[in-house]
Every structure is written in C-alpha cells, then in structure tokens.
Amino acid sequence: MVKHRNSSRSIISYSSSIARFFSRKAISLYLIFVFAFTIWVLVFSSRNIQTDDDHTKHQQQHHRDLIDSESFPPPYLPPRKNLQKPYENTQLWTPPFSFGLHPCVKPTPKYKEFSESDHYITVKSNGGLNQMRTGIADIVAVAHIMNATLVIPELDKRSFWQDSSVFSDIFDEEQFIKSLRRDVKVIKKLPKEVESLPRARKHFTSWSSVGYYEEMTHLWKEYKVIHVAKSDSRLANNDLPIDVQRLRCRVLYRGLCFSPAIESLGQKLVERLKSRAGRYIALHLRYEKDMLAFTGCTYGLTDAESEELRVMRESTSHWKIKSINSTEQREEGLCPLTPKEVGIFLKGLGYSQSTVIYIAAGEIYGGDDRLSELKSRFPNLVFKETLAGNEELKGFTGHATKTAALDYIISVESDVFVPSHSGNMARAVEGHRRFLGHRRTITPDRKGLVKLFVKMERGQLKEGPKLSNFVNQMHKDRQGAPRRRKGPTQGIKGRARFRTEEAFYENPYPECICSSKEHKEP
C-alpha cells in the first residue's frame, strides 16, 4: 500500500515535470511562430502596397501621357464630371409622340420612270455641305422633269470653306448612281463625243415650279448639254407634284449616302458617345467667324473682334448686305445664340449639369474663353477631337466638308438636337430627324429668349425657377413634334414670300411622311 502510494506520487511528479517542460517549450515555439508570421505578413503586405502604389502611379502617368500626347488612342473621352444624376424630367430626352407617322418615299402608280435621253445636265453645287446636299437633290428632280442624263455634280471648292474634296470623297458615288437608276440616269462624266459641244449656261430661277422646267426643255432644240451654275433652292418648297417631292426625299435620304470612310467613322463616334454617356445632346453651335461676319452679330465681342468681322463682310463679294445694325439683328432673333446664352437656355429647359453635350461646329470664334460660360454650366462638352484620335481624323484635316459630314451624322443620331441658329445644317438635320420618326429637336425662340436675356442684364430676372418657367412655356411647341410645313408669312407677296416659307427639307411632312393608315415602307 505504501509502495503503491509512493509509486503514484513519483508518476505524478514525473508527469508534472514533463508538463512544465513541454509547456515552456510550447510557449517559446508559439512566440517564435507568431513573430515569424508577423514578419512574413508585414513583408508580403508591404510588397503588395508597393505594387498597388506603383500601379496607381503608372495609371496616373499613363493618363497624363494620353492628355499630353498628340494622338489619343480611340476612343478617348475626358473623365465625365458631375456623374451624380439629380432628378431630371425624362420628357427632356424622349421623342415627341409621332402618332404612328412613318417615312414614305415610294413613287405613286402615276410616276413616270426614267427613259433614255441624249440630253445632259452638268452642275456646279454651291455652298457648304448641306446647301450642296439639298441642291443636288433639287437638281436630280430637275433632271427627271427635263428628261436629262445627270453628270455627277461638281462640288464647291471656292467658297469660304476652301475644300478641295470631290463628289466621291464625300458621298458614296456608286450608291448614288444605283439608287436613282429608275429616276434619272447618272454618269460620272460626259461622253467624249459630247464633251466638246457648246453648252447652255443657265442660272435657273430659285424656287421654281415644274412648269418652269418644262418650259426650259426648249433649250434641247439648240443644245445637248445644259450647265447649271448653282444648285441650291432650284425648286419650290410647296405646290409641287407629290412624286417630285418624294423623289427629292429619295435622293436626300437614300441616294446621297456619305462615303464609306465618313459613314464608318461617324457611326463609330456615335457608338463611343452612347457607350460613354448613354445619351447626349448634339449642339450645333453656329458661333464661327463666317456666320458672325455674315449676320453682322457682334453682341458680347470686343471692338477689335467687331472690326475684324466688319472687314471680312466688306471683303466678301457675294455677301450683298454690308451695313448691319447688330443690336437690331439680335432683337429680331436673327443672331446665333452665344455660348453663354445657350448654357442659360439649356439649364432653363431643365437639363442637368451632368448632361453630355457634343459640339457640332467648326472653330468657335474666341476659342475656349468664349466657351467658358457654357462649360461652367455644362462641364461635359465633347468635340470631334476628343472622340477620335489624330490618326482617325488625318483624312479630315483641312476638309471642312468632311468634318461637317461627321457633325451631321452625330447630330442626326443624337437623343436631342439643338441648333443655336437656323442655317442650312440646322434645317437639314431637323428635316432628317422628322423623317426618321420625329426625334426630339429643340429650336430656340431666339427673339423671345433675347427679351429674357435683356431682363437678366438689367437685373430684373435671374437664373432659377422663374426663368425656367418662361423658357419652358416659350418652347413647349418647339420640340420637333409632328406638324405640317409652314407656308409664307401673311402679307408678303411676290417672290419674297418664298424666303419666309419653311423649307421643304426642314419639314418634308406631309409628302414624305405618312400616317399609320398607309402601308409602312421597309
């Protein structure tokens, strides 16, 4: 019994010694393990932190390199500012209700198709891109009326834009010829046996009827070739046979497609804008030197700038009006809105500061300084140069007609189109957007807006809810909703009335836009 108790005590003592030994060793090992693990974590983390920091620095440097470089790898868009989206009326973006209207350009059963002819029309198109486009559409219809073969038009190379482009540089020549094969025979150049023959050189009367051109067919008795010196506004806006009007639409919207190079880049830029912004406004900011000089609008300019524009107007021979009262022009709504005025206008309509605005324009007179008041209200301004790289724009540099074509494509495809002045581009884009389904096009009431701007200058009104209410009431019926084309201003008689009519290409309804009761064309 005593032995057993002593034995048990020995075992317990031995076990306690072992436990104390292993306990001390375990603690030491544990401390060593913790210390080693801590060192490993610190080293690994510092490596990761350094790597991430290097990556961030690399990204920042890459971004700076992009901004500083001459050629942005497309698509390059500056970081969008003010991405937070405050409440914004969705009706600002949606197209007006179109009542089921749709394009209709097919000839009626009474239409007489092209028949072979040994008479030819050559034409020199005049003006900028859209003046030439609508003019060519008119001349195709004239050739059809006069039963003549049309030679591919020569483009204007001598006007303000000084663009050396030929027809095939701007338009898809083969598509033009092919699409009109039932309407007019189109050839690339005169046959050799005809080239040396004398030609009748004509300045066809503007806004003429079908009867006028039927009378002009007497020229075929003496000549095989008629050369038309100008192409724009050769046909009346109204009171023409429906088949003539639809032919004009077929030419403009189906025949005069842009060249593959222009169309491809234009659509790419539209895709880049939409993928970056989701939706955007195309602003035709007609605040270029030639427009201000032509209209005599000098509001907000320095004395030196005003004098520069006056000299330009005086020295441009085909601008007939030389002495212009700038204040009267502005009060009558005949001046393009300034960039600042456009900013006030768009803000008054309810567009948020985060709105992306594509500037469809040439060089803005006064540069970035003149754009600052617009940019302070809408920081997300986008230009061709920020959408495309230098390499993509290489073939467009020095060719104003080509760059105008890009602006046209981006404007037609925009969610909202806003022109600051009612020129050829604005009218053509509005008409095309109506044709495609009455896309939202907001036409500023410049005369009404100037009255509000004057009140603001006098301190009688400021930006805010009150101004916004005025602006919206003023423009509730100026957003591209379907309506028939407007006729001449009442009280104006003679040929002067034609200038007061709404242009056919600005609103081709009802001839080229039909109701849902009629069969939809493919």
From Swiss-Prot:
Its main location: membrane. One of its GO terms (biological process) is fucose metabolic process. One of its GO terms (cellular component) is membrane. Glycans are attached at residues 147, 325. CDD domains: O-FucT_plant. Keywords: Carbohydrate metabolism, Fucose metabolism, Glycoprotein, Glycosyltransferase, Membrane, Signal-anchor, Transferase, Transmembrane, Transmembrane helix. The chain crosses the membrane at residues 26-46. Its EC number is 2.4.1.-. Residues 54-67 have a biased composition (Basic and acidic residues). It is a single-pass type II membrane protein. It is an enzyme of class 2 (transferase). It is found in: Membrane. Belongs to the glycosyltransferase GT106 family. This is O-fucosyltransferase 38. It comes from Arabidopsis thaliana.
